[in-house]
Amino acid sequence: MAKFYYSDRRLACWAAGKNPHLGGSIESWLAAIKSDSSFRQTVKEDVQVNRLQPTAVRMFSWKVGSGPIDNPEKCNWHYVLTGEVPAQPTEPVKAREVVVPPVKVIPSPPPVPRPYFRPVGAFAPTRSGFIRATVERLSRKREESRAAALFAELPLEYPQGAPLVVPRGFAAMRWTYHATWRRWYDASDERALRVHPGGPALPPPPPPPPIQKPPSFEERLQAALERQSCARAFALETSLGLNMAWLGTAAIPSTSVCCADGRTTGGQTIAQEADPINHRVTSNTAPGRAQWISERRSALRRREQANSLQSLAAQTDMTFEQARNAYLGAADMVEQGLPLLPPLRNAYAPRGLWRGPSTRANYTLDFRLNGIPTGQNTLEILYNPVADEEMDEYRDRGMSAVVIDALEIAINPFGMPGNPTDLTVVATYGHERNMERAFIGSSSTFLGNGLARAIFFPGLQYSQEEPRRESIIRLYVASTNATVDADSILAAISVGTLRQHIGSLHNRTVASSVHAAQVQGTTLRATMMGNAVVVSPEGSLVTGTPEANVQIGSGSSMRMVGPLAWENVEEPGQTFTIRNRSRSMRVDRNADVGVALPRMSTTTRGLAGRGSVQVPKDCQAGRYLKTLDLRDMVSGFSGIQYEKWITAGLVMPDFKVVIRYPANAFTGITWVMSFDAYNRITSSITTTASPAYTLSVPHWLLHHKNGTTSCDIDYGELCGHAMWFNATTFESPKLHFTCLTGNNKELAADWEFVVELYAEFEAAKTFLGRPNFVYSADAFNGSFKFLTIPPLEYDLSTTSAYKSVSLLLGQTLIDGTHKVYNYNNTLLSYYLGIGGVVKGRVHICSPCTYGIVLRVVSEWNGVTNNWNQLFKYPGCYIGEDGNFEIEIRSPYHRTPLRLLDAQAASAFTSTLNFYAISGPIAPSGETAKMPVVVQIDEIALPDLSVPSFPNDYFLWVDFSAFTVDAEEYVIGSRFFDISSTTSTVHLGDNPFAHMIACHGLHHGILDLKLMWDLEGEFGKSSGGVTITKLCGDKATGMDGASRVCALQNMGCETELYIGNFAGANPNSALSLYSRWLAIKLDKARSMKMLRILCKPRGNFEFYGRTCFRV
């Protein structure tokens, strides 16, 4: 595999090529990579993931300075994309050039002038198109008045199928003007040729008018005045070159996306529009076509809104129509470009003695943004939506409260079209300290996209006395990439409200549409537990959605203290982040360190339970600390999540476990939190916690030097089934806390850390979760979860030390005299050997006063004693992140996954050897060893050998040494350990049995094969074997199919359904209503041995990852 050489320019070219939809030049990507180290690391990791792509090899396999794209002036993109290298010419370019004498071309005579009567197409000529085409000709002759008089007589458009009638005055014009018809006539209709087959001939004269009474003087005078006014109007239009244009705005459908941590506690976004740079759009189409375009645009907008709302409705219990009503309350006003706030007559019903609504909606906030604040300089504006005069007026009428039914934010930017500067406005309730609860809504846009509006229906109600504090609505304005001058006015931001004043004896008179939007918004807010719905216009001049980072409460803060008076306020802030596309909203409550708590992106997190773990001051390796029961944590806390659990009954949550402890880099302690879903290891770790148990179940490392740590538990995947609120079914979920590496420095006293459990309990739709493993012949894809090697300890007194990690990953773990089956070892035991590239990570668990330089290589048959040879081996140094990637070295290209009993691991297998080429070092007086923990994440490009038992039967159990003739064995609908008091039982040892042992539940169909041997002569044996399928129990159950096999048959076959009424069964004998199998022997002592083999049929599923001690 070629070595990659990285540079900022190469990474910028890679990022630009992978994200063509974001646009931007190579220099802009290069500036982003140089200024953001985390972004550079993200791009580098993406290159490493796709290092096998030809384009990646051509870009990064050259040394820096000699690559095809290193020189900005001579980038060979053709080679990067195609791999073609231009060959050197073998002869002069003109060696084979053939000189052809030029051919003299005789010009053709000019074409005969065509008649000016051109056919009329499907769309007849319009007045505006005809005027524009003719003004160019008449402007040269200064005949505006004559043209206006002629054109005024033309109809607006001709009906389809009607003959074309042209005035005589126009037909008498000169032949040079006939080309103007091409600008407004289509050649797809033959009506004109049918009317005038001879070419430029005058149309037939109109028939003489019928004889009638001559008009009176008044009628003739009125007709003359009308003709004169019409001629003047059209003369003015033609002289100025005006057109009656159709004016409209482009409606951009709003995109409503939930935040990454699933929190929303504010109002809901109803609609948003964008008018790109307020262009006037001139339409030369007929009115029928303009109407068709408008209807088509509306249909596309409704379809995009439906797709966005359909996904939102699918996440909640609301119907699609309910979600649409909550989010599109004022969407019908977007197309006209009007404000989104509905008129008062549409929002409120009249009330009072004189039928007058006590509402006001004219007091708005309008301010000019002079320089966009970026970074920590977030602009904060405290705004009171109700004037003091208005409050005094309605207070005298007996009103005691104000209700903000709707709030609109409008951003009208100034500057160049297409400017990618982003701008975000966040609206919150000013009297709420919790940001998530105070959130009303947010609007983000690019300044180059023009006017953008958003409307929210918060339903905010507050007292008449509160507005005097001048802080009802807080607005936060920020940008992430502003590049314009600081003293320029960039945008006008307006905030309008729709409100009403109510009293103790007054009912709210909000219209049904507004009320429905508020009710659905409240329901949505309660369902999603506060997800911030953020909108942003898309599809305008600047594509995509902005990425905002608003420091709430920090930087420049202004408070309105009067009509034209403001004051500055400084407050410690929080962070409001909007990621492009994902539209996440994160709130930073940890103001001390300034880092937001890690959150999941799929569920809303609410505190469900808590517990504490006591830590001794001298916490040594292998120390057992405490076990916390997840069910007891939730029920003991008795919070709102427990009430939801009782209501839902059956839940399958995603837990977020936050372990809060102070960071200390001098102790060197590393704890392990093990998730034991089926209570398999509790009895094995009460005295000493061996890593053979704590690292065999799903686990997480807690480093004391890192401080507070969080981890996610997908209960449906790790446990395998849902949990009932007041009793256990198959599970007994525990969190075990043990010490993996002990402390070097004893602390002053015993202490404890806090464990918080966050979850959102929603009713589960099924009992079983996702299967952890599905049996098939090629189930392994190279990736691991929770594969951690016990600590490697380096002695401080040795030099040139090394530690080896054996790659016998399919070997069963041994703890003293006990075998421990876990999932990773069992998974690899399905194969004889494996090769590939090992990817993993090294955790340095020592105190910060220790130091070491590690180099990892892969070796076969032990380690090398020649260090010069060592540095010739392929290897890598362990950096700060601890990641490593090394190919397995073996003379067989694979390493065995298990060994024979007499073989040693160091003599016949590949190992990962971690050489301390420098160190370990520590201050004087330190004697403790330096612990290092290795985690293996993946074996990339796995080179698997043949399976251990490809598509074959596994041995389940052998019965022998029968002591009675009438023997009966009950085989329940589960694969479990069978015992007997009247015969000797020997259980089979195979990968399938191990996989059953290290899972909580299993489900599928087994093909059973029964074989036996006889004691006496073959022909003299009598008796038989009866196999009966039953359901339920013997007393009240039901009998199914049955078959009898004579002993002389020496065997028979049947099948066994694994599962119960719930879907799956554990590997222990549990009395649940299910199918089972009875095997009866009437002459058991005539048999020497009874053997039962099994083979999984189809997709055999395993649920709930755990381990098992034999």
UniProtKB/Swiss-Prot annotation:
GO terms for molecular function: structural molecule activity. GO terms for biological process: transport of virus in host, cell to cell. Transmembrane segments: none annotated. Keywords: Capsid protein, Host cell junction, Transport, Viral movement protein, Virion. The keyword Transport applies. It holds the Pfam family Nepo_coat. Specific enzymatic cleavages in vivo by the P1 encoded 3C-like protease yield mature proteins. Residues 200-213 have a biased composition (Pro residues). Residues 195-215 are annotated as: Disordered. GO terms for cellular component: host cell plasmodesma; viral capsid. Belongs to the nepoviruses RNA2 polyprotein family. Virions are comprised of 60 copies of the coat protein. This is RNA2 polyprotein. It comes from Arabis mosaic virus (isolate NW).
